[in-house]
Curated annotation (Swiss-Prot):
Function: Negative regulator of class I heat shock genes (grpE-dnaK-dnaJ and groELS operons). Prevents heat-shock induction of these operons.
Name of the protein: Heat-inducible transcription repressor HrcA
Superkingdom field: Bacteria
Species in which this protein is naturally found: Nostoc punctiforme (strain ATCC 29133 / PCC 73102)
HAMAP family: HrcA
Amino acid sequence: MEVQLTNRQQHILWATVRHYIATAEPVGSKALVEEYDLGVSSATIRNVMGVLEKSGLLYQPHASAGRVPSDSGYRIYVDQLITPSLRSRSVSQTDATRTETLGREIEVALQKHLQWEDRSLETLLQGAAQILATLSGCISLITMPQTTTALLRHLQLVQIEAGRIMLIVVTDGYETHSKLMDLSPIPEETQRDSEVIDRELQIVSNFLNTHLRGRSLLELANLNWSELDQEFQRYGEFLKNSVAELTRRTLAPTATQIMVRGVSEVLRQPEFSQLQQVQTIIHLLEEEQDQLWRLIFEEPEPEDIGKSRVTVRIGAENPLEPIRTCTLISSNYRRGSIPVGSVGVLGPTRLDYESAIAVVASAADYLSEAFSYFNP
């Protein structure tokens, strides 16, 4: 059920979250009066905090303590309260420009990596992961890219035996994919003449290379084959189905290595004081990367392809048990409009959401630019 807050409740929830993020200590009304220009008395703040607690947005760790945000409180903070007008209510006016400043910092840092003489994409991603961990103060996660946007370099149809041919596809990264196909749709009298088949397959191969070289495999999977010329038409139906199956099989996202940086610093924070919790998180990062990859690499809906989107999962919103007390912020980086990898940060729910979201968004945009640079 969606919680409707008054302006005063919003401001006090915002200040409580900000103060707890900064101090890691339960927040009392006196601290908010001293640190934030809320324009109300300490008694009023206590009353409002009590209402927020009853709504499930704050809670008391123990009876004599102040209050801390719940997962639901953080969710409202992220979805509704991170706005310039609310940030400007802080005594410290630097909060109002922190997002823009951090965005520029990561842009400058990543631009420096883009100018390296060693223009290896893997080297760039390693550097980006370290920068992301440093600027966010979180564990950084960057997945190695998918081959979903590989371009067709060469296509060849080869007769293997009577009635069977092999389709061979070579991508711009020199990866080879093949599929064995049955020639049963072709008239029997043609199948019996092996030389005729060889000549026709070469003609079709040449024709397809001329018209399709340089296209992405995604385009091939969705190609309107009926637009191609007459030389192709006699082989049309089975090639259409076979190429579509081959390219879709190649395009299916598969878990890739996740580059992880910043673990030791984050795990020193008070939220990770329990050794068993630390061990389960490290095990996930090192031994269960497939599960984590499926969580941070999101295939967009067709209407969202090409759009930048940052996903924030807070606490129990994470389906993986080891990180159900953590926040995971992630976004895809793209080649053109197609997502090929993900960038993210993992930290306690008590993290600087404004900064972390800005850093992840900037990193994803720059990795998209870099991927196009290294793979024009």
